[in-house]
Amino acid sequence: MTSTLRTRLAIVAGVAATTLVLAGCSADGGGEPDADTITVSTFPFGVEEFQEAVIDPFTEKTGIEVVVDTGSNSDRLSQLQVAGGQPDVDVMLISDYYAALGQEDDLFQQVDASAVPSLDEIADFAKEDTYLGPAYSYQLNGTMYSTDELTADEAAEWSLYSEDELSGKVALPDISVTAGQLMVSGVAAEYGDGPYDIDAALDQLGEWAPGVLQFYSSSTEVTNLLTQGEIVAADSLSGFATDLVESGEPIAWTAPATGRYMATNRAMIPTGAENVDGANQFVDYLLSVEAQTSSAEIVGDLPVNPGATVPDTIEAVVGDIASDPVAAGYSTLDPTELVPTRSEWVDRFAREVTSR
């Protein structure tokens, strides 16, 4: 089934969000909620790929049409807060930190396991009790590097960022982005007493800072630095390397020797959602082998369902880690440790690291 795509602008509390209708026909403009329509809120990138991989097949399978709202994590969470328990969203796909932040304000409800049988199929880390909704994909932190300049073993060591000969030739993520928190926790685990030892992490990062060419805040920044030869290595998410490796660039990605952490993207159902039944059906399909395989192939998402097929493009970057990241030494971070400290850590990172 070919879905139509149209864009409307929704402004909530001064925040503009793009809305796309990805369905055979649009939902009614008012009146009672439509049991055959759900609204899914997701990230503002890769929407057409997500439509092809998940939305269209879901609509064909269930007859449920899907309206897709897009926006940043923070903007979409703000919209839920403004909605006051009467959201116009049935499913929100959001990063784990923001999912936890929303739970603090009771913005999400528990996903009913009895209504989502695919939960039985996914990896244990994807259904942690800490979250009210399951993970549907995840992101691995590691080092992206020039294969002309470094070996995988060299790139895997955190001490890489302290080497005099590489001063000015490396980059690190800002703590405000996903890779940044994973990096901070990796450094804390290597040089301190665990992933939340912020004092040890900031001390070490502060020592490295003068030799760091840039603390980046987007994938475009770091990939450009690497492909243009301005740096030889950078801490990054594995997904940043996929297109570069596929295109034949002399670039690879490797997991760190120690301090391996991953972030997850969660499927959350907002408190007060109008079509919970439709939301459950969507989450169930999203976690299925069919959708997970398609999403890995088309979107590039790492699947949480072990039965899904991992495409060659992903395996070329992460190898067999994708089949079982926990067995490969990766773990998730505890949001109860991160949510209360987030503002303080971001402020300290700016003072003690990036300003040096």
Residue ranges of predicted features:
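Short, low-complexity disordered leader/linker segments with a strong preference
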Residues: 1-39, 354-356
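Early extracytoplasmic/lumenal segment of secretory-pathway proteins
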Residues: 25-27, 33-100
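Extracytoplasmic ligand-binding site segments that recognize negatively charged/polar headgroups
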Residues: 44-51, 88-230
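Short, hydrophobic alpha-helical packing/hinge segments within bilobed ligand-binding/sensory domains
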Residues: 76-80, 99, 161, 222-225, ...
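A ligand-binding cleft/hinge motif common to bilobed small-molecule-binding domains
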Residues: 97-101, 227, 232-250
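Periplasmic-binding protein-like
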Residues: 139, 203-208, 247-271
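Conserved C-terminal helix/tail region of periplasmic/extracytoplasmic solute-binding proteins
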Residues: 327-356
